[in-house]
Amino acid sequence: MSSVTSSTGRRSALLIAGILLIATTLRVVFTGAAPLLDAIRSDYGLTTAQTGLLTTLPLLAFGLVSPLAAGVARRFGMERSLLLAMLLICAGIALRSLPSAAWLFIGTAVIGCGIALGNVLLPGLIKRDFSQHVARMTGAYSLTMGGAAALGSALVVPVAMAGFGWRGALLLLMIFPLLALLSWLPQSRRQAEAPLTGSGAMHNRGIWRSALAWQVTLFLGINSLVYYVIIGWGAPALAEIGL
């Protein structure tokens, strides 16, 4: 009995560690790029509109990919879908660090797709596997996500100024999804969940006609708009006035 309890405890600890490490990736690769926008713009000779597109592409990916996340999870399972999200983020970081403006934009879009999957699936995983501790786990992963975002923003400029350049600084951020990827490999071996059918599927279709769902969507959308505008342009604005 004690060995079974110990094994269950280890699995839970690994699951929690994996969730928190995934949470570190869901903002840091976005916030880490913001302080370097001026350097990126100068290096490639980008216009203001093109530079703005770098901060907009992830948001467009969120809007396009997020509605597809549930279908991906039904097809491959939550665990494997989150593994795919980490792979996409790693690939996107590598692509945007290549010496080409085209790859910069492509990599940024790929990163946005990976983050979109993680944003949708991670709260669902917490609700499924920690149904008795949803508030505690949600608070822990939100705190971890915010802390990693702040850490990334603080690190990239000193790293870039130390001789690694903005590409090296952005590439350094791959540490976060790589650690999450490695920690999540044991979880990804779990059997994918069965497709959602019957009343559950009908409920998901009915949500498009729910007034409450649209109100929540509007509230969270405005909240995200304010957050990403500040994250994307706050650092360049402060740098421009010498802070």
Over which residues does each language-model region extend?
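Conserved MFS/SLC helix-loop-helix module at the cytosolic interface between two early adjacent transmembrane helices
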Residues: L64-A102
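Cytoplasmic helix-loop-helix junction between adjacent transmembrane helices
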Residues: T108-L143
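Helix-loop-helix hairpin linking two adjacent transmembrane segments in secondary transporters
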Residues: A101, Q132-H133, G139-R189
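Juxtamembrane intracellular "pre-TM" segments in multi-pass secondary transporters
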Residues: S2-G9, R189-V216
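Short hydrophobic/alpha-helical segments at membrane-entry points of transmembrane helices
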Residues: A102-T108, V216
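Extracytoplasmic gate region of multi-pass secondary transporters
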Residues: A33-A34, A211-L243
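Residue-level signature of mid-helix packing/kink "hotspots" within the transmembrane helices
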Residues: T31, L59-P67, A150
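Extracytoplasmic
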Residues: L15-T48, S66-A69, I230-A235
